[in-house]
Curated annotation (Swiss-Prot):
GO terms for molecular function: metal ion binding; sequence-specific DNA binding. It comes from Caenorhabditis elegans. PROSITE patterns: DM_2. Residues 58-93 are annotated as: Disordered. Disruption phenotype: RNAi-mediated knockdown causes defects in patterning of the dopaminergic neurons of the male-specific genital sensilla (simple sense organs) known as rays. Males are unable to sire progeny due to abnormal tail and gonad morphology, whereas hermaphrodites have no obvious phenotypic defects. Expressed in a limited number of non-sex-specific tissues in males, including 6-8 unidentified neurons of the head, ventral body wall muscle, and the PHCL/R neurons. The lineage of its organism: Eukaryota, Metazoa, Ecdysozoa, Nematoda, Chromadorea. This is DM domain-containing protein mab-23. Residues 8-56 bind DNA.
Length: 175
């Protein structure tokens, strides 16, 4: 019976399934992919890691008590950002859930990747066109040309027809 193949979720987002497991995490071509699906997976992994850390800090230290009796060592905090928990007073009903959430608020700082929209991803992919296509695009040669192209593209205002009339009237009044 063949070994079960590893399914990388980042590759699966892009239609590639059954990647070989050994060394794939370091070699995954979508490891730093900015698309929204990959960003969601990365955020989910980060949140899972935070959840594991919370469970680990909330578990009683049963394994360490036996070793700490044999060799006394000074206690050191697990992390400088872990605040002390307030004592939990049991209540009934919906308040129990709210109190458990509010009493377990801990300060964890985790940098999550930015999620980009599909439109932004398409624009990024257009920018990754081959060099020949990018050379065909006209680039402004001066600041004035760049400003002119911006003004031309700016006609997406909802008042563009009124603005065009105002520009037309001012041009005819100058003549």
């Amino acid at each position: 019976m063949p070994k079960e193949q590893y399914m990388c979720q980042l590759c699966a987002n892009h239609g590639i399934f059954n990647q070989p497991k050994k060394g794939h995490k370091q070699k995954c071509p979508y490891r730093t992919c900015p698309c929204s699906l990959c960003a969601l997976n990365t955020k989910r992994r980060a949140l899972d890691q935070i959840e594991r850390q919370l469970k680990h800090t909330n578990e009683p230290m049963t394994g360490q008590t036996a070793t700490s009796m044999a060799s006394p060592t000074p206690e050191c905090p697990l992390s400088p950002t872990t605040p002390k928990m307030t004592p939990h007073t049991p209540t009934s009903g919906k308040d129990t859930f709210r109190n458990s959430i509010s009493s377990s608020n801990m300060a964890f700082t985790v940098q999550l990747p930015a999620t980009i929209t599909k439109k932004e991803l398409k624009l990024l992919r257009r920018d990754d066109t081959p060099l020949q296509n990018s050379l065909e695009r006209p680039f402004p040669r001066s600041i004035d040309e760049a400003i002119e192209t911006i003004k031309k593209e700016k006609m997406s205002s909802i008042f563009h027809s009124a603005e065009m009339l105002a520009v037309g009237e001012s041009a005819t009044s100058l003549i």
